[in-house]
């Protein structure tokens, strides 16, 4: 049975919400068996396309990957990130968000920002588009924030994040991502906000957690401090590639067990090549 936003909200304070990113059909199919929520994140720009940041990710890219992920799911809620500069007015936000939902079949969109995007969030929610909020460290704002740094370390920054989170919730977001903030602030917001908080680098005080799946699986040697690598796929893949190349070079692959047997037509062709033509 497909989870919906009410199912996610009902888990607040009762059951931790497990979320991961996915960008492809095969990965989404695996995640769907176990995760409550799958985010088609704009982190696809860095993890799949090798971009320096998320700022170059386009709406078409998000829709293409959203389609692939939705095709694979049978249970998890699927949320698609709205890319940079795709929601700077309520009307533009609705135009692009409605396209994402209609073309991918996803359940909701995610917007980065607090007070500055509250109007856009309210505009979408009022028109039937569920929204996931995102405050704290916001990758689309990294130039303004001075890089990818922990947020909320000063009193003014802490207050700003609290105002952002409150504005997002009041605008109608069904849950909110808290990224790279202190454990005490995450705990305070989780207690105060009426909707689930999903942490990424924000401690286990949050109602749920999310990670970039490539980081969690150890597919890169570079990853943030807050990531726990539950596998080491980078070395597993390297070992597999080395083994494959060695087997090819030594003519060990393909073996007889990997080849097809001759059918009647081929046997005739080999015995009487001119007659088989």
From Swiss-Prot:
Look up the record and name the cofactor or cofactors this protein needs: Mg(2+)
Disulfide partners: none
UniProt xrefs under SUPFAM superfamilies = Phosphoenolpyruvate/pyruvate domain (SSF51621)
Biological processes annotated in GO:
pantothenate biosynthetic process
Tell me the domain of life. Bacteria
Reactions that this protein is recorded to catalyse: 3-methyl-2-oxobutanoate + (6R)-5,10-methylene-5,6,7,8-tetrahydrofolate + H2O = 2-dehydropantoate + (6S)-5,6,7,8-tetrahydrofolate
- The parts of the chain that form a coiled coil are none
EC nos? 2.1.2.11
Write out the pathway annotation from the protein's UniProt entry: Cofactor biosynthesis; (R)-pantothenate biosynthesis; (R)-pantoate from 3-methyl-2-oxobutanoate: step 1/2
UniProt keywords (A-Z) are: Cytoplasm, Magnesium, Metal-binding, Pantothenate biosynthesis, Transferase
Gene3D superfamilies on file: Phosphoenolpyruvate-binding domains
- Where in the cell? Cytoplasm
Binding residues annotated for Mg(2+), in chain numbering = 42, 81, 112
**Might you report a single GO cellular component term?**
cytoplasm
Summarize where 3-methyl-2-oxobutanoate binds, as residue positions.
42-43, 81, 110
Cofactor binding summary note: Binds 1 Mg(2+) ion per subunit.
Subunit structure comment from the entry: Homodecamer; pentamer of dimers.
Q: Which NCBIfam families match?
A: panB (TIGR00222), PRK00311.1 (NF001452)
Q: What does this protein do?
A: Catalyzes the reversible reaction in which hydroxymethyl group from 5,10-methylenetetrahydrofolate is transferred onto alpha-ketoisovalerate to form ketopantoate.
From the Swiss-Prot or TrEMBL record, give the protein name: 3-methyl-2-oxobutanoate hydroxymethyltransferase
